[in-house]
Amino acid sequence: LLLNSIVNASISPENLYITWGVFVISTSLSYLYSAQSVILTADQNVYLVKLITGLTRSLAYILQIFLMICGVSFWIVCAIELLSNVIQLILFNKLTLKKYPQLVKLDITDTINKENIISVKTKIKREIKYTFVHKIAGVVVFNTDYLIISVFLGITVITSFSSYMMLIQALAFLISAIASPLGAYIGAKLYSDSKEKVIRIISLYNSLFFMLGIFCAYMFYISSSTFVSLWMGKEIVLSQQLVLLLSVNCFVLIARISFDVAKVGLGYMSDIELPLLEAIINIIVSLVLVHYLGLNGIVIGTIVSNIIVVMILKPVFLYKNALKSDNAFIIHELIRSWFFISIFLLSIFFITRAKVIVSNEWLDFFIQVCMSSITPLLLLIMIYSVFYSNVRKFMFVMFKKNYREN
């Protein structure tokens, strides 16, 4: 009954509930190999985790798209998702047994005493509870928009909205995959270097991901509508005003990666009130504004929760509670981040007027995207290099390293 009320469309109960059940089982299977992925990540082998998950998911997506184009039954398409997780489970089990055969014969009671076992179990249970709250709140935050759109605006609006969101999520997924090893690096530095050096590293990462988020958000704003038009047709294209709002969410989704990576590296998951607050703000503001602004109001609800929680409270909690930084440093970090964003927006609007790309051919579109990316990229590098010595030193080291290799 709940699914029928949420999905405002004429779909038979069999198709609705069986499809839902398949995806629930598929998601549940992913938890069966979570322990193996944790072991590999902790042992600095996160690239193996990303290799397995990346390859299987990519192949599954390609096969699903091909089958849908060929008009194959949707049940088979759903089965591919299930098969993908089964293959990942098999691969993770085989890889873990091959790399760590001692785990099969290991008796943990021989290595640590009972008091330590109880202490470790208590800590693990606490962290699992915190992580569970984070995951549940994350599911609510990232799926609230779709539910509210389905209930109040109809399922047809989701097609246009999801087309743009898929581009944003694809960017975030790619960048997250690249950034995931940084968590293990921060964790290693926490035990080998001083707290001040760890703070400088995290501050550098925040600046770099802010740069990346600003760049991706700008490129999304000027190119996403043309991409969607060429891909799915002009009737799917959203207004440029709404695309601007989605660009803000694109920026936040990428910029927040640095905070999430730092939290994993520091082992800090105690801020369970933040994701709950983010979900509550998102739901309340979206439910209120959808009656006045429609789809724009729902997106604004997400922006409000993102800015308050993700861009302000999350870094404050991270620096203050996990790194024990003083208030002056935290305020300085926040002001500097937003100062760079303001300088970039004023400069790019003055130079390019944020002209939206218009094209009727794929080749011409990609050429325009490449050409339009040069100015904002150079501008970002110049702004951060001039105003932030940490980024300037990093770029100098990278340039010097590449020069020596060549």
Label for each model-derived stretch:
Residues 105-108, 321-326, 332, 348-406:
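Membrane-proximal transmembrane or re-entrant/amphipathic helices at the cytosolic face
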Residues 2-23, 220-251, 323, 358-363:
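Interfacial segments at transmembrane-helix termini and the short loops linking adjacent helices
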Residues 78, 90-142, 185, 193-200, ...:
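Interhelical loop/hinge segments that connect adjacent transmembrane helices in multipass membrane
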Residues 4-8, 66-71, 132-135, 139-170, ...:
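Helix-terminus/linker motif at the lipid-water interface of multi-pass membrane proteins
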Residues 124-128, 162, 194-223, 240-243, ...:
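Interfacial transmembrane-helix starts/ends
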Residues 41-42, 100, 105, 164, ...:
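Helix-loop junctions and terminal segments of transmembrane helices
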Residues 74-79, 119-127, 149-169, 197-200, ...:
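Interfacial/gating helices of multi-pass transporter permease domains
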Residues 22-41, 49-64, 77-93, 134, ...:
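Short runs within selected transmembrane alpha-helices of multi-pass transporters and secretion channels
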